[in-house]
From Swiss-Prot:
Disulfide bonds: none
Keyword Transferase in annotation: no
Any one of the GO CC terms: small ribosomal subunit
Gene: rpsN
Assembly, per entry: Part of the 30S ribosomal subunit. Contacts proteins S3 and S10.
Keywords tagged on the record: Ribonucleoprotein, Ribosomal protein, RNA-binding, rRNA-binding
Family annotation (InterPro entries): Ribosomal_uS14 (IPR001209), Ribosomal_uS14_bac/plastid (IPR023036)
Highest taxon listed in the record's lineage: Bacteria
Molecular functions (GO terms): rRNA binding; structural constituent of ribosome
Keyword Oxidoreductase attached: no
Family stated for the protein in its record: Belongs to the universal ribosomal protein uS14 family.
Protein's UniProt name: Small ribosomal subunit protein uS14
Length: 101
Protein backbone atom coordinates (compact mmCIF):
# COMPACT_ATOMS: atom_id res chain seq x y z
CA UNK A 1 0.00 0.00 0.00
CA UNK A 2 1.43 3.34 -1.06
CA UNK A 3 1.42 6.35 1.24
CA UNK A 4 -1.82 8.28 0.98
CA UNK A 5 0.13 11.51 0.51
CA UNK A 6 1.85 10.10 -2.60
CA UNK A 7 -1.47 8.99 -4.08
CA UNK A 8 -3.02 12.40 -3.33
CA UNK A 9 -0.05 14.23 -4.87
CA UNK A 10 -0.38 12.15 -8.04
CA UNK A 11 -4.11 12.95 -8.25
CA UNK A 12 -3.31 16.65 -7.85
CA UNK A 13 -0.80 16.37 -10.70
CA UNK A 14 -3.49 14.81 -12.92
CA UNK A 15 -5.70 17.85 -12.28
CA UNK A 16 -2.87 20.27 -13.12
CA UNK A 17 -2.03 18.37 -16.32
CA UNK A 18 -5.67 18.52 -17.41
CA UNK A 19 -5.92 22.23 -16.59
CA UNK A 20 -2.90 23.20 -18.70
CA UNK A 21 -3.25 20.59 -21.48
CA UNK A 22 -4.77 22.93 -24.09
CA UNK A 23 -2.31 25.77 -23.45
CA UNK A 24 0.62 23.36 -23.44
CA UNK A 25 -0.48 21.78 -26.73
CA UNK A 26 -0.85 25.22 -28.31
CA UNK A 27 2.66 26.26 -27.22
CA UNK A 28 4.16 22.97 -28.40
CA UNK A 29 2.46 23.41 -31.78
CA UNK A 30 3.88 26.94 -32.10
CA UNK A 31 7.30 25.62 -31.15
CA UNK A 32 7.48 23.15 -34.06
CA UNK A 33 5.57 25.26 -36.62
CA UNK A 34 7.73 25.39 -39.79
CA UNK A 35 6.17 28.71 -40.85
CA UNK A 36 6.82 30.37 -37.49
CA UNK A 37 9.45 33.03 -36.97
CA UNK A 38 12.36 32.73 -34.59
CA UNK A 39 10.69 35.27 -32.29
CA UNK A 40 7.46 33.27 -32.12
CA UNK A 41 9.39 30.08 -31.36
CA UNK A 42 11.34 31.86 -28.63
CA UNK A 43 8.09 33.21 -27.17
CA UNK A 44 6.56 29.72 -27.25
CA UNK A 45 9.62 28.24 -25.55
CA UNK A 46 9.52 30.86 -22.80
CA UNK A 47 5.77 30.34 -22.38
CA UNK A 48 6.32 26.61 -22.04
CA UNK A 49 8.98 27.21 -19.40
CA UNK A 50 6.64 29.47 -17.43
CA UNK A 51 4.03 26.73 -17.07
CA UNK A 52 4.08 24.81 -13.78
CA UNK A 53 6.42 21.84 -13.64
CA UNK A 54 3.52 19.52 -12.84
CA UNK A 55 1.71 20.59 -16.04
CA UNK A 56 3.83 18.09 -17.96
CA UNK A 57 2.05 14.74 -18.41
CA UNK A 58 5.32 12.88 -17.87
CA UNK A 59 5.15 13.84 -14.18
CA UNK A 60 2.00 11.74 -13.62
CA UNK A 61 2.78 8.28 -12.31
CA UNK A 62 0.69 5.26 -13.34
CA UNK A 63 -0.45 3.66 -10.11
CA UNK A 64 -2.48 0.64 -9.08
CA UNK A 65 -6.14 1.65 -8.90
CA UNK A 66 -6.70 -0.42 -5.75
CA UNK A 67 -3.73 0.26 -3.48
CA UNK A 68 -1.63 2.86 -5.34
CA UNK A 69 1.43 0.68 -5.97
CA UNK A 70 3.72 2.65 -8.34
CA UNK A 71 5.78 -0.21 -9.78
CA UNK A 72 4.81 -3.19 -11.92
CA UNK A 73 1.68 -1.55 -13.26
CA UNK A 74 -0.25 -3.30 -16.05
CA UNK A 75 -1.75 -0.36 -17.93
CA UNK A 76 -4.31 -2.51 -19.76
CA UNK A 77 -5.94 -3.41 -16.44
CA UNK A 78 -4.92 -0.43 -14.28
CA UNK A 79 -3.60 -2.66 -11.51
CA UNK A 80 -0.20 -3.90 -10.40
CA UNK A 81 1.22 -7.29 -11.33
CA UNK A 82 0.83 -8.49 -7.74
CA UNK A 83 -2.85 -7.51 -7.56
CA UNK A 84 -3.41 -8.91 -11.09
CA UNK A 85 -2.05 -12.31 -10.03
CA UNK A 86 -4.22 -12.42 -6.91
CA UNK A 87 -7.37 -11.40 -8.77
CA UNK A 88 -6.69 -13.85 -11.61
CA UNK A 89 -6.22 -16.75 -9.17
CA UNK A 90 -9.50 -15.90 -7.44
CA UNK A 91 -11.29 -15.68 -10.82
CA UNK A 92 -12.18 -12.00 -10.48
CA UNK A 93 -10.86 -11.13 -13.95
CA UNK A 94 -13.15 -12.54 -16.65
CA UNK A 95 -11.37 -14.18 -19.57
CA UNK A 96 -8.01 -14.48 -17.78
CA UNK A 97 -6.70 -18.01 -17.41
CA UNK A 98 -3.40 -19.34 -16.16
CA UNK A 99 -1.14 -20.59 -18.95
CA UNK A 100 -0.38 -24.28 -19.00
CA UNK A 101 1.55 -26.26 -21.61
Amino acid sequence: MAKKSKIAKNEQRKVVVERYAAKRAELKKALVDPNGTDESREAARLGLQKLPRDASPIRVRNRDAVDGRPRGNLSKFGISRVRFRDMAHRGELPGITKSSW
